[in-house]
């Protein structure tokens, strides 16, 4: 009975609670630039494009600016978003209208988890807060910071904290149910990580591993390494799994920061393949290919069967790309100037380019049904319907 209940569950700053330092992507990029001793490369110039796929804009909405690692919460034709000022909103994907909107009046560090009814965020004061129908349901103090959106499923709220603990709370009352503490590392990435459900297993990214947990008690069912820490310093050894994954049935594919892309059979808990890849953003995919953006702006496609490279394009080099997302015939990436680039899934050729509000698209774009939703750093929300 309980198993069915969970089925489909479908700048360095020192932390106060552990001897773990938090490092942002910007910090890593600055350190890399300093070590290379060279100037930052100039972004590739954008060439004129003849639109080969249509992507009409459906609606827009607006939030306050967003500087934390927002992970949109998608469920049941809704998308839940949040902004720096503590605003949390659930939008109807079809119309862009507010289902509800409220303010927690406190800055947010992680969010938004949503099952379409309950939304959950973590504040900079290390509080887990749940919201339902635009009203605060409960809040609980956490012992550590969190940068990954809470995961809401099966009547529970799960939190991956910066000390690499996984915590489960009762969705109605906020009562803590269990904590699973895994071995810590000297550094943790200040970026959204990986949490999802595959069948009756909670799958979490812990350091360079995908780990399967029993959602009822937190016990470990399996671990599959996507990357092993290497290098001469803690920054080079940082291999946290980053948010933005691809899942097809029991197969889950993810990126290890600066290290690799790999796929795991989460039903059996075994590694299928892993390939070196030097990127910092999440991935996307379809039934044939896994798509990623590398640190230098190259966009790559790997075969999902074995990880071998299918194609790569350098037309967007050094444009500070977002994670990709598959939308219609295209794989779509955003850049630091608010452009959306539509590339062919077959060969990476340019199919279209759209603009938003001119601010960076560093938040992973989302697809809900046939609707592509893009959120910018200045708080603009744009919905398109690509062919």
Task: Give, region by region, the residue ranges found by the protein language model.
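Short loop/turn segments that connect beta-strands within beta-propeller blades
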Residues: 92-95, 132-135, 170-173, 215-217, ...
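Blade-level signature of beta-propeller repeat domains, shared across WD40, Kelch, NHL, RCC1
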Residues: 356-387
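Structural signature of WD-repeat beta-propellers
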Residues: 83-84, 123-124, 161-162, 205-207, ...
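Loop/turn-rich, solvent-exposed surfaces of beta-rich toroidal or solenoidal domains
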Residues: 293-300, 308-342
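C-terminal motif of bacterial Sec signal peptides marking the signal peptidase cleavage site
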Residues: 30-33
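Extracytoplasmic beta-rich repeat domains
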Residues: 37-73, 100-116, 137-153, 176-199, ...
């Amino acid at each position: 009975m309980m198993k069915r209940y969970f089925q489909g569950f479908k700048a360095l700053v020192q932390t106060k609670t552990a001897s773990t330092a938090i490092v942002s992507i910007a910090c890593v990029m600055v350190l890399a630039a300093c070590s290379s001793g060279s100037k930052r490369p100039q972004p590739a110039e954008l060439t004129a494009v003849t639109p080969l796929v249509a992507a009409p804009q459906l609606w827009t909405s607006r939030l306050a600016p967003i500087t934390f690692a927002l992970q949109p919460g998608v469920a049941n034709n809704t998308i839940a978003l949040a902004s720096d000022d503590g605003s949390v909103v659930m939008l109807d994907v079809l119309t862009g209208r507010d289902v509800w909107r409220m303010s927690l009046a406190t800055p947010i560090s992680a969010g938004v988890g949503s099952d379409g009814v309950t939304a959950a965020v973590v504040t900079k004061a290390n509080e887990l807060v749940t919201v339902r129908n635009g009203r605060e349901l409960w809040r609980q103090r956490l012992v550590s910071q969190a940068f990954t959106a809470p995961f809401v499923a099966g009547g529970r709220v799960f939190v991956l904290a910066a000390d690499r603990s996984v915590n489960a709370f009762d969705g109605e009352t906020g009562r803590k149910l269990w904590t699973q503490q895994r071995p810590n590392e000297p550094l943790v990435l200040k970026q959204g990580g990986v949490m999802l459900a595959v069948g009756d297993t909670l799958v979490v990214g812990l350091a360079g591993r995908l780990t399967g947990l029993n959602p009822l008690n937190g016990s470990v069912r399996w671990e599959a390494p996507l990357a092993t820490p290497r290098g001469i310093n803690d920054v080079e050894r940082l291999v946290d799994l980053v948010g933005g994954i691809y899942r097809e049935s029991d197969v889950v594919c993810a990126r290890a920061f600066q290290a690799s892309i790999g796929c795991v059979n989460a039903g059996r808990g075994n590694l299928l393949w892993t390939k070196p890849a030097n990127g910092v953003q999440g991935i996307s995919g379809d039934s044939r290919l896994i798509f990623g953006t590398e640190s230098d702006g190259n966009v790559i496609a790997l075969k999902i069967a074995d990880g071998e490279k299918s194609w790569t394009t350098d037309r967007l080099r050094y444009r500070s790309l977002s994670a990709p997302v598959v939308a219609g015939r295209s794989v779509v990436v955003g850049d630091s100037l608010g452009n959306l680039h539509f590339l062919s899934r077959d060969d990476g050729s340019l199919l279209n380019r759209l603009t938003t509000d001119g601010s960076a698209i560093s938040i992973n774009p989302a697809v809900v049904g046939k609707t592509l939703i893009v959120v910018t750093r200045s708080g603009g929300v744009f919905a398109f319907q690509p062919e």
